[in-house]
UniProtKB/Swiss-Prot annotation:
Top-level taxon of origin: Bacteria
Family per similarity comment: Belongs to the universal ribosomal protein uS15 family.
InterPro entries to which the protein is assigned, alphabetical: Ribosomal_uS15, Ribosomal_uS15_bac-type, uS15_NS1_RNA-bd_sf
UniProt record, GO biological process: translation
Xref: PANTHER family: RIBOSOMAL PROTEIN S15, BACTERIAL AND ORGANELLAR (PTHR23321), SMALL RIBOSOMAL SUBUNIT PROTEIN US15M (PTHR23321:SF26)
GO molecular function: rRNA binding; structural constituent of ribosome
Gene coding for it: rpsO
Subunit note: Part of the 30S ribosomal subunit. Forms a bridge to the 50S subunit in the 70S ribosome, contacting the 23S rRNA.
GO CC term, one of those recorded: cytosolic small ribosomal subunit
Name of the molecule in the record: Small ribosomal subunit protein uS15
PROSITE patterns documented for this protein: RIBOSOMAL_S15 (PS00362)
SUPFAM superfamilies: S15/NS1 RNA-binding domain
Organism of origin: Fusobacterium nucleatum subsp. nucleatum (strain ATCC 25586 / DSM 15643 / BCRC 10681 / CIP 101130 / JCM 8532 / KCTC 2640 / LMG 13131 / VPI 4355)
Functional note: One of the primary rRNA binding proteins, it binds directly to 16S rRNA where it helps nucleate assembly of the platform of the 30S subunit by binding and bridging several RNA helices of the 16S rRNA. Forms an intersubunit bridge (bridge B4) with the 23S rRNA of the 50S subunit in the ribosome.
């Protein structure tokens, strides 16, 4: 799992840019990937599964916002993160 600072440095406009949509989506994607691996091992951890579903919903809303705001940025971000087919 990459650190938060590394993700912010890669996707943010500056190192203090923690609130931009791209950074938020990248951070959520990292958390989602980590939690997905956890749930593969711990299949009955329903509490974490609920948290995962909430994170996926939040990322979906942020991606919809980014689509409306900056379509080219959206396409570049999903290609970089590999979250769409």
């Amino acid at each position: 799992m990459r650190t938060k600072a590394e993700i912010i440095k890669e996707f943010g406009k500056s190192e203090a840019d923690t609130g931009s949509t791209e950074v938020q989506i990248a951070l959520l994607t990292e958390k989602i990937n980590h939690l997905t691996e956890h749930l593969r091992v711990h299949k009955k951890d329903f509490h974490s599964r609920l948290g995962l579903l909430k994170m996926v919903g939040q990322r979906k809303r942020l991606l919809a916002y980014l689509t409306k705001k900056d379509l080219e940025g959206y396409r570049a971000l999903i290609a970089k993160l590999g979250i769409r087919k």
